[in-house]
């Protein structure tokens, strides 16, 4: 049997456990001709352990209208905001600082994100997350 032909890849950010046919999920999957409810059921089942977080998901659509999807770890900015209790980052990050984060907190976030980051070890991953913090107006403590 020949491999299925990939027609399209759809990238979305959906709140864990709360996928429903309303936008943004419905229109994106409807255009590809997928069964929206089937995706919602599978996604909600897979992501129920991470409720409350927005998860990036990559949906691969095949020529026979079947699909597979991969859920990734939450965005680093979301994890940073959650770790230090922020609502939003700074509008002017270099002049107005909105919070502080410790190296230990950075390491926890880096461990969570490690599989999705382009880093070889935990120190490189921590540096990537620290860069995200700086661009949000969060001071990184040594």
Curated annotation (Swiss-Prot):
InterPro entries: Ribosomal_uL11, Ribosomal_uL11_bac-typ, Ribosomal_uL11_C, Ribosomal_uL11_C_sf, Ribosomal_uL11_CS, Ribosomal_uL11_N, Ribosomal_uL11_N_sf. Belongs to the universal ribosomal protein uL11 family. It comes from the Bacteria. HAMAP family: Ribosomal_uL11. This is Large ribosomal subunit protein uL11. The gene is rplK. Pfam families: Ribosomal_L11, Ribosomal_L11_N. Part of the ribosomal stalk of the 50S ribosomal subunit. Interacts with L10 and the large rRNA to form the base of the stalk. L10 forms an elongated spine to which L12 dimers bind in a sequential fashion forming a multimeric L10(L12)X complex. Transmembrane segments: none annotated. GO terms for biological process: translation. Keywords: Methylation, Ribonucleoprotein, Ribosomal protein, RNA-binding, rRNA-binding. One or more lysine residues are methylated. Forms part of the ribosomal stalk which helps the ribosome interact with GTP-bound translation factors.
């Amino acid at each position: 049997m020949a491999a299925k032909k990939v027609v399209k890849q759809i990238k979305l950010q959906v709140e864990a456990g709360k996928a429903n046919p309303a936008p943004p999920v419905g229109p994106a999957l409807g255009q590809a001709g997928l069964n929206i409810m089937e995706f919602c059921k599978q996604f909600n089942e897979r992501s129920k352990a991470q409720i409350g977080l927005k998860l990036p998901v990559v949906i691969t659509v095949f020529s026979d209208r079947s699909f597979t999807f991969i859920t990734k770890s939450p965005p680093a900015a979301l994890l940073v905001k959650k770790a230090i209790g922020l609502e939003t980052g700074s509008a002017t990050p270099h002049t107005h600082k909105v919070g502080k984060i410790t190296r230990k907190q950075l390491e926890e976030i880096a461990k969570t994100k490690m599989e999705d980051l382009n880093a070889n070890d935990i120190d490189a991953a921590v540096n990537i997350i620290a860069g995200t913090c700086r661009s949000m107006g969060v001071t990184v403590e040594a």
